[in-house]
Swiss-Prot record:
Membrane topology type: Multi-pass membrane protein
Gene (name only): atpB
Annotated PANTHER family: ATP SYNTHASE SUBUNIT A, CHLOROPLASTIC
Cited HAMAP family: ATP_synth_a_bact (MF_01393)
Pfam families: ATP-synt_A
Superkingdom, taxonomy of origin: Bacteria
Protein name in UniProt: ATP synthase subunit a
Keywords: ATP synthesis, Cell membrane, CF(0), Hydrogen ion transport, Ion transport, Membrane, Transmembrane, Transmembrane helix, Transport
Amino acid sequence: MEESINPTINIGPVTFDLTLLAMTLLTVFVTFGLVYWASRKMTIKPSRKQNALEYIYDFVIDFTKGNVGEHYMKNYSLFLFSLFLFVAVANNLGLMAKVQTTNGFNLWTSPTANLAFDLGFSLLVTVFCHVEGIRRQGIKGYLKGFVTPGIMTPMNILEEFTNFASLALRIYGNIFAGEVLAGLLLTWAHQAAYWYPIAFIMNMVWTGFSIFISCIQAYVFTMLTSMYLGKKINGEVE
């Protein structure tokens, strides 16, 4: 497999990955575009695209409301719905194409196949959960969850780091591995003409499986986020 790198730009001491930035913005635009396209001109008798959008929304609500709580669901339903769609689109973008320059620069990838993105995104989601916990319970009620019972305080603090790490590493491992194998199959197809039909069929099968796994990972990421959010806004329930 040929080695490829993403083009970067340095602004002061900070290095920006241009491919990652572009693909993240593309994910935002695609997610917004899909929702806008499916929701414009909504009618009492829904069209197929409106039905699809409502089905996804109801699906997200159904598997997260038990964690967040029905009394809070109306406050966080759009957040969780947007999160699910964003992660699903981000996971699948890299499967749509492979764009690479002659000098080895990679111009197309799933944002979630990058560990730095996954760590940053998971940190953002984790901070959101903590902020909402403080807003709903107050600082006293929020801190009580860490020190009750007192002997479990170190484990409660450690759990916050493991929750954050599990969000990032789980999605990174699955999406990165999927792109690597897809790249290997494409490389194999270019080795010799007689390998092309076999590699093409295997790549089609693997792409279909990867789309399924990508959607499962979006489901898992949203489910875990709703669990962490529910614990923070409702307090620890024994």
